[in-house]
C-alpha cells in the first residue's frame, strides 16, 4: 500500500548521522503496477532559511549505477560515508544548502529500486528508463504536493548525459503544469557517440596514455560505432588501450587508485580486471574510487540503515546492495547515438542548459564534450575565459546562445567528489542563471 502523503517517508535519523538543520525523506514510488517496478528515491531538503529553494533531480549514469551510491554518498549529497561504513560525516559543500535535492535510483534493479518482473533487468534501455522516470516524477509530485509548480531542474553525470536530456524532453513535451521544468545540467556526460569517441581518443593520446599505433587503431575501429554497443574490432582496440594505460584511475587521471585488496574482481586493484568486470564498454561504468565506493557498499548493506531509509522493507531484495548493477549494464538495449537533436529542441524551447566537465576525467573527457557541443554550431556570446573561485582559476567557460559550457580544473569524472567547493559554486551560478565569475577587478 502506498503511504498516504509524504510524512511516512520522513527519515527520523540515519545510523551514525550528525545532527542537521534540514529534513530528509526516502521511499518507493511504483512506476509500473503490472510489472511491479518500483523506484527508490532520497530527498535531502534545503534548510528552512533557504526555502523556498528550487527542486533538483540528480541522476547518476552507468547505465546501472545508483544515484544514492554516487551522487548522494560521495559527491553532492549531504553526507560522506566513513570507512567501513561506520557512519556519516557532513559534507561542507552539500548542494542541499541551496536546493532541495532529489536522488533517484533508476532504472528498476539499480540500488534499492526493484522490479517483480525478473526479465526487466535484462531488457532495460533509454526509452523505458525515461518513461519510468517520468512516471516517478508525476507520482512523486502527488506525494509531495507542496513542490508542485516549484522551479525544477534535472542534473546528472556520465551516462545521465542520456537520461537527463531524454527525461527533460519528456517533461517538456508532457506540458504537465505541475512540473515547472526550468532547465538541465549535465556533467562529463555522453552527448554524441561520434564526437565523444573522437574527443576521448584524442585526449588519451594527448595525455600520453596510449601509443600512436593504438590511437590510429581506435579511430579506425570505433569512430562509426555506438558507444554502448561497440563492434568486436572496437572492443579489441580498447582492450589494447586498457593494457597500455596500466593501473591508473581513468576517472581521475592524477589521483591514486584504491589499494585496499578485496576478493571480488570489481574491487580488485588490477584496473584491467576492474574494468572488465564493469562490462563491455569499459570507460562508462562504475566510478572514481580510491575506496569511497567500498564505504558506501558497507553502509547501505547494513540492515539498520535500510530500515532507516524505508528501503528493502520486506527484505525481498535477497541480493547484496551494490553501487552498480553489472547485469543491467551488460544487457542495455536501446541507446540513441546522439543527444544533439534533443539539445536542439530544448535550446529552442528556451530551457537553461549547462554542460560541465572535470578536466582530468579520461572516461568522458572535456575534449569529447567540446567536440560534441561544437557540433551544435551555436553562436558564441562569451568566448572561452577563465572563471575564478577565491581568486584562483576554478576552470574555464564559454557561453553560447542557449547553452553554457564550464570546465572544472583538476576535477575527475565525479566533479563534486574531486572539487567539492568549485562544484557548489558552479551549481549556485547555474541556479541563478549567471555566467561563471571572471577575475574580480580589485584582485591584485
Swiss-Prot record:
> Which InterPro entries does the UniProt record give?
AB_hydrolase_fold, Peptidase_S10, Ser_caboxypep_his_AS, Ser_caboxypep_ser_AS
Report the sequence similarity comment from the record.
Answer: Belongs to the peptidase S10 family.
- Alphabetical keyword list: Allergen, Carboxypeptidase, Disulfide bond, Glycoprotein, Hydrolase, Protease, Zymogen
Catalytic machinery residues: 158, 361, 413
Which residues are removed as the propeptide when the protein matures? Answer: 260-286
EC class of the enzyme, as a word? hydrolase
Catalyzed reaction equations: Preferential release of a C-terminal arginine or lysine residue
State whether keyword Chloroplast applies: no
GO biological process, alphabetically ordered: proteolysis
Oligomer status and interactors = Carboxypeptidase II is a dimer, where each monomer is composed of two chains linked by a disulfide bond.
Q: What is its EC number?
A: 3.4.16.6
- Please state what the protein is called: Serine carboxypeptidase 2
Which Pfam families does this chain map to?
Answer: Peptidase_S10
Residues annotated as binding substrate are: 60-62, 157-159, 409-413
Q: Which GO terms describe its molecular function?
A: serine-type carboxypeptidase activity
- Keyword Membrane recorded: no
The organism named in the record is Triticum aestivum (Wheat)
Q: Give me the glycosylation sites of this protein.
A: 116, 127, 259, 312, 318
Q: For this protein, what post-translational modification is recorded in UniProt? A: N-glycosylated.
Cystine connections: 65-324, 222-234, 258-291
Amino acid at each position: 500500500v502506498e503511504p498516504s502523503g509524504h510524512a511516512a517517508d520522513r527519515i527520523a535519523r540515519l545510523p551514525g548521522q550528525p545532527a542537521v538543520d534540514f529534513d530528509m525523506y526516502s521511499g518507493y514510488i511504483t512506476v509500473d503496477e503490472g510489472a511491479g517496478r518500483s523506484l527508490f528515491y532520497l530527498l535531502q531538503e534545503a534548510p528552512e532559511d533557504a526555502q523556498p529553494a528550487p527542486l533538483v533531480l540528480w541522476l547518476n549514469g552507468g547505465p546501472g549505477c545508483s544515484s544514492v551510491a554516487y551522487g548522494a554518498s560521495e559527491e553532492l549529497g549531504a553526507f560522506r560515508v566513513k570507512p567501513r561504513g561506520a557512519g556519516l560525516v557532513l559534507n561542507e559543500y552539500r548542494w542541499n544548502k541551496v536546493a532541495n535535492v532529489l536522488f533517484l535510483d533508476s532504472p528498476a534493479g539499480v540500488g534499492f529500486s526493484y522490479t517483480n518482473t525478473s526479465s526487466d533487468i535484462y531488457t532495460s534501455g533509454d526509452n523505458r528508463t525515461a518513461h519510468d522516470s517520468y512516471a516517478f516524477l508525476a507520482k512523486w509530485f502527488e506525494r509531495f504536493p507542496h513542490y508542485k509548480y516549484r522551479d525544477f531542474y534535472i542534473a546528472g553525470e556520465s551516462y545521465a548525459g542520456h537520461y537527463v536530456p531524454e527525461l527533460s524532453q519528456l517533461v517538456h513535451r508532457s506540458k504537465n503544469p505541475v512540473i515547472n521544468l526550468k532547465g538541465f545540467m549535465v556533467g562529463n556526460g555522453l552527448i554524441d557517440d561520434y564526437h565523444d569517441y573522437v574527443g576521448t581518443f584524442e585526449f588519451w593520446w594527448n595525455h600520453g596514455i596510449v601509443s600512436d599505433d593504438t590511437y590510429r587503431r581506435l579511430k579506425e575501429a570505433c569512430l562509426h560505432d555506438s558507444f554502448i554497443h561497440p563492434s568486436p574490432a572496437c572492443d579489441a582496440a580498447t582492450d589494447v588501450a586498457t593494457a597500455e594505460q596500466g593501473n591508473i584511475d581513468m576517472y581521475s587521471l592524477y589521483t591514486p587508485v584504491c589499494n585496499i585488496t578485496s576478493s571480488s574482481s570489481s574491487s580488485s586493484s588490477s584496473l584491467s580486471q576492474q574494468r572488465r568486470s564493469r562490462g563491455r564498454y569499459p570507460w562508462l561504468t562504475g566510478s572514481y574510487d580510491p575506496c569511497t565506493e567500498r564505504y558506501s557498499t558497507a553502509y547501505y548493506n547494513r540492515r539498520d540503515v535500510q530500515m532507516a531509509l524505508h528501503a528493502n522493507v520486506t527484505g525481498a531484495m535477497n541480493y547484496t546492495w551494490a553501487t552498480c548493477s553489472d547485469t543491467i549494464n551488460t544487457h542495455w538495449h536501446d541507446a540513441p547515438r546522439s543527444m544533439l537533436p534533443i539539445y536542439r529542441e530544448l535550446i529552442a524551447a528556451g530551457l537553461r542548459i549547462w554542460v560541465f566537465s572535470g578536466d582530468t576525467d579520461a572516461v568522458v573527457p572535456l575534449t569529447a564534450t567540446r567536440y560534441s557541443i561544437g557540433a551544435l554550431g551555436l553562436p558564441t556570446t562569451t568566448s572561452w575565459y577563465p572563471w575564478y573561485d577565491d581568486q584562483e582559476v576554478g576552470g574555464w567557460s564559454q557561453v553560447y546562445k542557449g547553452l553554457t559550457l564550464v570546465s572544472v580544473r583538476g576535477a575527475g569524472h565525479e566533479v563534486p567528489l574531486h572539487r567539492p567547493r568549485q562544484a557548489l559554486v558552479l551549481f549556485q551560478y547555474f541556479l541563478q542563471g549567471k555566467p561563471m565569475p571572471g577575475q574580480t577587478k580589485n584582485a591584485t
